[in-house]
């Protein structure tokens, strides 16, 4: 089974997409990979575990080999978000599912949204697992190893690029769906939940690197 089909299997299993969406999502992935048709006669591989990271990495490797993207950390991250975005529910659908669950249980709705962000690879589960943690009575010390170091080539590209001023910030409401650019992360797999708090409009979102539990 190809990395693309394993990714689609994972997305279907975690309900990021429905069975009826599979062909559409595949075509979105093919466009991103600059392929005309799916790979045939791929070697059999085990299904993905609890994240889509392995399949995304394999697709990025293939994209590098074929010259679709550069082999830098930032290029891979931008491309991974683009691929993950192909199997992430639309902002409207995410909000609809959240508030349907919220009417029955706000706690369950929040847990669902958190899990969806993990499944869609917005929360970088595999990277977070690399963090070093030390515990003492009433204290937890974390050494953050999950956020990748900047590649000098990526730093040079960011210096060459013009400041766009959009989105206004990395936490602003314009981010979901944004393709990213040198120095600014891609957000195709990012989703927010709108909330009304004391008569004001706010949005709930998670951090990709979870500096503390469900942050």
Q: Each predicted region: which residue ranges?
A:
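Active-site microenvironments that recognize anionic phosphate/pyrophosphate groups
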Residues: 1-214
């Amino acid at each position: 089974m190809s990395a693309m089909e394993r990714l689609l299997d994972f997305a279907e299993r975690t309900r990021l997409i429905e069975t009826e969406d599979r062909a559409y999502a595949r075509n979105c992935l093919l466009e991103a990979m600059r392929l005309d048709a799916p790979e045939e006669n791929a070697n059999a591989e085990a299904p993905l575990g609890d994240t889509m990271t392995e399949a995304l990495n394999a697709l990025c490797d293939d994209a590098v080999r074929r010259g679709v993207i550069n082999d830098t950390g930032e290029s891979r991250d931008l491309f991974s978000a683009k691929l993950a975005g192909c199997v992430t529910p639309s902002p409207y659908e995410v909000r609809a599912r959240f508030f349907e669950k919220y009417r029955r249980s706000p706690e369950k709705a929040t847990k669902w949204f958190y899990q969806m962000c993990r499944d869609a690879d917005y929360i970088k589960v595999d990277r977070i697992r690399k963090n070093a943690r030390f515990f003492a009575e009433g204290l937890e010390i974390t050494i953050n190893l999950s956020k990748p170091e900047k590649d000098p080539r990526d730093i040079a590209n960011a210096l060459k690029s013009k400041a766009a001023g959009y989105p206004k910030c990395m936490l602003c409401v314009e981010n979901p769906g944004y393709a990213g650019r040198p120095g600014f992360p891609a957000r195709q797999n990012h989703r927010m939940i709108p909330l009304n708090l004391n008569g004001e409009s706010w949005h709930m979102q998670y951090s990709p690197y979870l500096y503390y539990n469900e942050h």
